[in-house]
Structures are given as C-alpha cells and as structure tokens.
Amino acid sequence: MTATTQPFVYRYPGLIPGILRKRYKRFLADIELASGEIVTAHCPNTGPMTGICELGAPVMLSKSDNPKRKLAYTWEMIQLPTPEPTWIGVNTALPNRVIKAMLLAKQIPELADHYDTVRPEVRYGTENKSRIDFLLTGEGRSPLYVEVKNTTWTKGKLALFPDTETTRGQKHLQELIDIVPAAKAVMLYFINRGDCTRFAPGDSKDPKYGELFRQAIAAGIQILPCRFAVSPEGICYLGLAPWESTEISGVG
C-alpha cells in the first residue's frame, strides 16, 4: 500500500476482502471470499484493465443491501505487488464522484479560482449530442469544460491513458479542441493508484489519441494528471503528476 499522510477525499464503506478468480463478459468477476465461498461480483469497468486484472490477486468488494440488485457485490479495487503492494481502483464510476466532491470543496488548486458553480453532465459538442463531465462557470469568467478519465495502466511509475484504442476518448478530445478558444477546457486524468509519479498519453495502444492529445496541448487545453492513493479505507489526493506529451519521452 502506498503510504500517505494526506486526508481522505473519499471514504469507502466497509469493504470485504477476497481473491480474484475470474473476470468475464466485461461486467462480471468471480471472487473467492475468506470463507472459501465463490461469489459473482459486478465489475464496474468496461475496459480491458490492461496490466491490472491479475488472477489470484487480492481484491476488495462493497456489498449492497438493495434486494432489487441482481448482484449484491461490486468489485472496488485490486492489489498488485509491483514494485511494492499497491491498491488500484477498479470502479470507473467513482472518479467522477470524487472529482465532483473535490470541485465543490475547491480542493483542486489549479481550478479553484475559476468558477462559482459546478454543473455535471452538461450537453455540448457536435449537435449538442455529447456530455461534458463538468462545466464550471463564474461571473466574469470563461466557461471551463472538464473531462475526467480514469487511469490505471502503467509502465513502471509512468501512468498512461488510454490502455486500449478508444474512439470515444478520441471524440472527447476533438470536441474539447473544437470549443477552444470560445471556452476553456481541461483534461483531468484520475490516476487511480498511488505508485505513479508521471503521466503520458498511451501512444502504443492508441496512436490517434496520442496525436489528438498533442493537438489539444497546442490548442491550449489544460492537462491535469491528478495522483490518488487508494486503500480499503479511502482515497487520498496526492497532487499533480508531471506529464510528457508522448509515451516514448515519458518512459524511463
């Protein structure tokens, strides 16, 4: 676990330990509990989970008491041993909840002076068919569009996004490029593990995304790779990671 003295920006409910035995159909995972029972948990992550979906690894589950839910358990995090035991957030719905709370509390210094109001899931883009994660507005200030991306793939201590080809991610970058300079825009990468110290685009997985990332920089879009330490108790904000414009320049 990555040690930190930072306060929690999110606290988990009581979590249940287990061991990952199988992930399948994207949304399902078989987890062995301490009792030896195998339960099927919801996997709230549609991506390939490159480099983090290791069978036999320790995991943590949350449990819902809602009788209407088909699956009571949700897979929240996994622990990997490289280079020291590190918890990695699996639930891709959680970063937006954490960032919303941080924005409301003005806990991201680079953005805190630029808004009075936080609006989630606002329509924008071509024919108004897309939704931005957060629109920040304030009197006398340009609108600030914030897109959040969960980031868990690494090479050493270098965090990389994306971990697979993402036409959706490409579209989001292009639409942010298109709204500048009429408005301001931020790409916020939620580094959902505490063992990374730098960030770069994942050119080797999605060269087109890497190209758009560099176009976004040239257009004036702000890049905020936010580092978080994850533990079964909660999530702590560690500040920004330095970033590189290409994967090759970031490796090493």
Swiss-Prot record:
This is Sugar fermentation stimulation protein homolog. Belongs to the SfsA family. GO terms for molecular function: DNA binding. Coiled coil: none annotated. It comes from the Bacteria. It comes from Picosynechococcus sp. (strain ATCC 27264 / PCC 7002 / PR-6).
